[in-house]
Every structure is written in structure tokens, then in C-alpha cells.
From Swiss-Prot:
It comes from Litoria rothii (Roth's tree frog). The keyword Repressor does not apply. GO terms for biological process: defense response. It is found in: Secreted. This is Rothein 3.3. Expressed by the skin dorsal glands. Lacks antimicrobial activity. Does not inhibit the formation of NO by neuronal nitric oxide. Its main location: secreted. The modification Leucine amide is found at residue 30. GO terms for cellular component: extracellular region. Keywords: Amidation, Amphibian defense peptide, Secreted. Belongs to the frog skin active peptide (FSAP) family. Rothein subfamily.
Length: 30
């Protein structure tokens, strides 16, 4: 989650946010 959070913090691509959020959920579920 922290990795994707860092990406979101430095990226204005709002369309990627849902994708990164999904990756956060997958990683936290492992």
C-alpha cells in the first residue's frame, strides 16, 4: 500500500488511482 501511495503522491494521473488502489488491496491481502 505504501508503494502505491508513494506513486499516487507523485502522480496526477487520476485514472491510475483506482488501479493502484486495487493493487494495494491485493498486496494487503497476501
Amino acid at each position: 500500500a505504501s508503494a502505491a501511495g508513494a506513486v499516487r503522491a507523485g502522480d496526477d494521473e487520476t485514472l491510475l488511482n483506482p488501479v493502484l488502489n486495487s493493487l494495494d488491496n491485493l498486496v494487503s491481502g497476501l
